[in-house]
């Protein structure tokens, strides 16, 4: 009997078994409960104890309001003790380190398929092209507006010119 394997109270209880794990290999899914409705008790919003709005740990009976504190809790000694989990760090060999460094070097040199390579010059050039297209659209809109606007014709034009009236409407020309 060692410190991680205390004696069992009843012979076949899985609750008392120690789980030995290494580092996390899977990602923690923070979005699994997004857009789900949960009914909470009346006093659920006060404190960390008990079920409430946020991430709930059944082993520790605590609720966490943000993902950072939830992740900290999952790695805390309190949670690991309650879930009877022992994390053993495996020391990497020289070959594994070299292999991992080679993998990341290849990742840096080869951009992912289907994604554009980051180029500042291209982005600036594209931005200027979009600005020019926007200016051209504005100019076309202004020309179309002037074509379609009603003009004074005949004698009324002369009379308006004598009176100093050039147009009706806004002062922006």
From Swiss-Prot:
Zinc finger (Matrin-type) residue numbers: 55-85
Keywords for this protein: Coiled coil, Cytoplasm, Cytoskeleton, Metal-binding, Nucleus, Zinc, Zinc-finger
| Protein's UniProt keywords contain Coiled coil | yes
Q: Which GO terms describe its molecular function?
A: nucleic acid binding; zinc ion binding
Extract the Pfam families matched here.
zf-C2H2_jaz
State how it assembles: Component of the 25S U4/U6.U5 tri-snRNP particle, a subcomplex of the spliceosome.
Entry protein name:
U4/U6.U5 small nuclear ribonucleoprotein component snu23
Q: Which organism is it from?
A: Schizosaccharomyces pombe (strain 972 / ATCC 24843) (Fission yeast)
Q: Which gene encodes it?
A: snu23
């Amino acid at each position: 009997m060692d410190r991680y394997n205390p004696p069992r109270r009843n012979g076949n209880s899985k609750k008392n078994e120690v789980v030995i794990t290494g580092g996390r290999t899977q990602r923690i899914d923070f979005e699994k409960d997004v857009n789900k409705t949960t009914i909470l008790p009346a006093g659920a919003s006060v404190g960390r104890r008990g079920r409430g709005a946020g991430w709930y740990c059944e082993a520790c009976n605590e609720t966490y309001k943000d993902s950072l504190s939830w992740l900290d809790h999952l790695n805390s000694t309190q949670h690991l003790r309650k879930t009877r989990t022992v994390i053993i760090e495996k020391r990497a060999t020289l070959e594994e380190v070299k292999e991992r460094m080679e993998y990341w070097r290849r990742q840096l040199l080869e951009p992912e398929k289907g994604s554009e390579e980051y180029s500042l010059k291209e982005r600036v050039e594209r931005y200027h092209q979009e600005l020019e297209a926007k200016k051209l659209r504005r100019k076309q809109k202004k020309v179309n507006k002037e074509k379609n606007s009603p003009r004074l014709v005949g004698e009324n034009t002369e009379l308006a010119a004598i009176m100093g009236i050039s147009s009706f409407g806004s002062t922006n020309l």
